[in-house]
């Protein structure tokens, strides 16, 4: 199969061995695959990324950087076939799936972060058959690839204390942060303040219905949320979706007493916090990786029912040959929100899908 293979920090488009579904597994033809923030970290900070996996004792993000790797875990596609004993949606059915597979030794691997299980930056993927969900006909198959990143936002808000009239702040409005904004609004939280330096991303948060959007260089989002919530400080849910060293400590110092901080952004290096500040303020910190499995299906349903417009979040598309350009562009968040990789698209650049909104907050 054709694939964009990561070698020495660059993507090279070439032939790669076809994955073969084992017992309980499915073979899927890739329709589209999103580029995740963790993909950017894995390429730019490979040693730290792998060290964190080893130090945490997880096998989900371990790969050999000296061997070819086909990344991409935010995928959608069509079922081609099944391995022994596997059943699921009929071949030809459009699907999305939780990106996991079990290797012959019984170890769970993440598709796209395993040398043995190539991801959606290749033409075909092998995943566990039970991880697949059919895409409803009301949802474009390519746009269904946004199910995974949005599920991270929805799933972690579902685990939080956020409810009706809970003041909330979302720091970082990439796809995960925007999923968190939508999830908070769905639960009746408010005021919901979204913070991002990028006007493009602030505009997306505003379109979703955030009560206020701010540039953190100009205004502190936590203080603004407190002002909007009223004179008496109230416990707040703060969702930190940026992997910026020092941000967690900064939030500890500014949030109201009793706040819950969801740390979703992955800081690749060691960081420093002053725990006693959080202790004195009775702050809860929840480190967040992914989502309860049922939230994946619930997020797919939200997209299919039109409760979120995935097309408004996709700002660019590229083929395998455009991956280097797409990664470079996503490191400049003022340019894009989500870039989808489409196997059939040619060229070496990123094609813009959506112009910045005229009513973009400045």
Locations of the language-model features?
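Glycine-rich beta-strand-centered segment in the early N-terminal region that forms part
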Residues: 19-33, 48-101, 136-138
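NAD(P)H dinucleotide-binding glycine-rich loop of Rossmann-like/cofactor-binding domains
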Residues: 61-68, 73, 97-171
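Residues in the short beta-alpha loop(s) of Rossmann-like NAD(P)-binding domains
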Residues: 198, 267, 291
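Residue-level recognition of short, solvent-exposed, well-ordered loop/turn junctions
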Residues: 22, 90-93, 128, 163, ...
């Amino acid at each position: 199969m054709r694939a964009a293979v990561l070698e020495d920090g660059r993507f090279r488009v070439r032939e790669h061995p076809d994955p073969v579904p084992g017992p309980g597994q499915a073979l899927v033809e890739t329709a589209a695959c999103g580029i995740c923030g963790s993909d950017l970290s894995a390429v730019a900070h490979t040693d730290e990324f792998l060290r964190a996996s080893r130090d945490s004792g997880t096998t989900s993000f371990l790969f050999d950087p000296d061997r070819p790797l086909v990344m991409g875990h935010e995928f959608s596609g069509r079922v081609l076939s099944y391995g022994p004993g596997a059943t699921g949606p009929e071949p030809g059915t459009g699907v999305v799936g939780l990106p996991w597979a079990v290797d012959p030794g019984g170890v769970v691997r993440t598709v796209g972060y395993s040398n043995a299980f190539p991801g959606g930056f290749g033409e075909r993927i092998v995943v566990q058959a039970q991880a697949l969900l059919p895409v409803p006909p009301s949802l474009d198959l390519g746009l269904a690839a946004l199910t995974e990143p949005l599920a991270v936002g929805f799933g972690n808000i579902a685990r939080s204390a956020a409810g009706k009239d809970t003041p909330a702040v979302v720091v970082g409005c990439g796809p995960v942060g925007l999923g968190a904004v939508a999830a908070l609004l769905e639960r009746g939280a408010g005021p919901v303040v979204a913070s991002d330096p990028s006007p493009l991303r602030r505009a997306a948060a505003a379109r979703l219905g955030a009560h206020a959007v701010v540039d953190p260089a100009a205004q502190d989002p936590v203080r603004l949320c407190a002002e909007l919530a009223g004179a008496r400080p109230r416990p707040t849910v703060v969702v930190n979706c940026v992997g910026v060293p020092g941000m967690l400590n900064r939030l500890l110092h500014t949030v109201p007493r009793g706040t819950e901080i969801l740390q979703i952004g992955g800081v690749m290096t060691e960081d420093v916090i002053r725990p006693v500040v959080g202790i004195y303020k009775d702050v809860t910190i929840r480190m967040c990786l992914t989502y309860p499995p049922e939230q994946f299906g619930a997020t797919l349903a939200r997209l299919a029912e039109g409760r979120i417009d995935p097309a408004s979040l996709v700002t660019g598309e590229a083929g395998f040959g455009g991956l280097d350009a797409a990664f470079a562009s996503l490191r400049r968040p003022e340019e894009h929100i989500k870039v989808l990789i489409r196997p059939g698209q040619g060229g070496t650049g990123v094609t813009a899908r959506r112009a910045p909104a005229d009513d973009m907050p400045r």
